[in-house]
Amino acid sequence: MEFYPVAIEKLIEEFAKLPSIGKKSAQRLTLHILNLPKDEVEEFANALVKARGTIKYCSVCGNFTDTDPCAICSNPNREKDIICVVEQPKDIMTMEKVKEFNGLYHVLHGTISPMQGRGPQDIRIRELVARMSGDVKEVIVATNPTIEGEATAMYISKILKPLDVKVTRIAAGIPVGGDLEYADEVTLSKALEGRTVI
């Protein structure tokens, strides 16, 4: 893109690194930002820097937080005997929109994927097992219905079985190969209601 100054090309390149942002979208975002008033651009940049500097992972569940433990883990009104296992922090946001689940969460930060060289030791399964105490009665596995999500669900079921914890899987309704983030609230609610033992 030799017709753009180097600074614009660099900004387009950086935006294009974001998920679901192609070259055209990156170009549109860049041009939009360049047309904003300087104070709005500075506010945007400061918000990015502040979020990156203050947001961390909850030491209990692995969710994004600015306090430790996070607001969900430290909420006395949450059910402590049920944990919903998800792949990423964004999945907690999706589940919370449904307003059907009042337990705790556990974020794996990935799935088991031998093809990508990712085994159980590379995601937060050890931390999940460590959370199994006399209080936890059920673990709902809400990984995405992909090959990796299913493999991860089966592994979790196998590893928790000796610990006398009921392990369930969210029900059909989420399409195979789908992503929880894109499921509507009714579908996700029905999937939670119809979960099955694995």
Curated annotation (Swiss-Prot):
It comes from the Bacteria. Residues 81-175 form the Toprim domain. CDD domains: TOPRIM_recR (cd01025). Keywords: DNA damage, DNA recombination, DNA repair, Metal-binding, Zinc, Zinc-finger. Transmembrane segments: none annotated. It holds the Pfam family RecR_HhH. Belongs to the RecR family. This is Recombination protein RecR. It comes from Clostridium perfringens (strain 13 / Type A). The lineage of its organism: Bacteria, Bacillati, Bacillota, Clostridia, Eubacteriales. The gene is recR.
